Amino acid sequence: RGLGDVYKRQACQVQAALALPENRPALDVNAACSGFLYGTAVARGLLATLGGQYALVIGTEALSRLMDPADRSTCVLFGDGAGAAVFELTDTSAPFAITLGARGDAAIHAGGPSRAGSAPISMDGRAVFRFAVDALPKCLHTVLDETRLTLEDLSWVVCHQANSRIIDHCVKALHADAAKFYKNMDRHGNTSAASIPVALNEMAEAGLLKAGQKVSCIGFGGGLTWGGMLVTYSPLSHG
């Protein structure tokens, strides 16, 4: 992995592959495991600023390239993946909210590698756990407050699929119904920015998502970053 990979614009390649016109902006957003949520916020802002009705947001990671196989406390947790969602800007009263945050002072900066992109990922798992179980419930409360909804109004809560214990801890802290919290990390591991859209796709294919359901997605990632959103689900029509 060299500078060619670092500066390669994935979004532009997708735009070309889909044969989209030149007046459809395409850009990459990097916010680690929070990337899908950050990308959704950027997409919503672009729709509001430039006009348009639909935005395609893709979360994708190939973390196996950045793992140190000797670091068994980290490398066994992650997987490669990609997922996508189409967002529609509507004139209806369907509730929507999104919140983001960052704490740059909490990052651990390793020594610089001799080649760009060659430093493996390292993580203080216990510190991340403490951060996550505090940030995720706050994100959920924020989007619920903004939409004047309650946990009971939600059909699903889709967390970043980092760790089952983190999700369980959030369920307990929120006094929530664990059945509303989807999990798939036992099959895919932590796929970083891909984890939320991959989970949503699995749920849609399994018939778990129904039109009109209110769904909250919450996540956290390196940086440190975090975010949450509340959307109304609508099946993607083909035609």
Residue ranges with predicted function:
Residues 8-20, 56-63, 112-114, 166-176:
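Acidic-glycine-rich active-site phosphate/pyrophosphate-binding loop
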Residues 8-10, 67-71, 226-230:
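Short acidic, glycine/serine/threonine-rich loops at helix termini
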Residues 1, 30, 54-61, 87-88, ...:
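Short beta-strand segments
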Residues 21-23, 29-51, 155-239:
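Claisen-condensing/thiolase-fold acyl-transfer catalytic domains that form or cleave C-C bonds
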Residues 2-7:
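Short, small-residue-biased leader/transition segments that mark boundaries at the very start
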Residues 69-134, 138-141, 220, 232-239:
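Condensing-enzyme catalytic core mediating Claisen C-C bond formation in acyl metabolism
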Residues 138-155, 203-208:
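Phosphate/pyrophosphate-binding loops at sites that engage ATP/ADP/AMP, CoA/4′-phosphopantetheine
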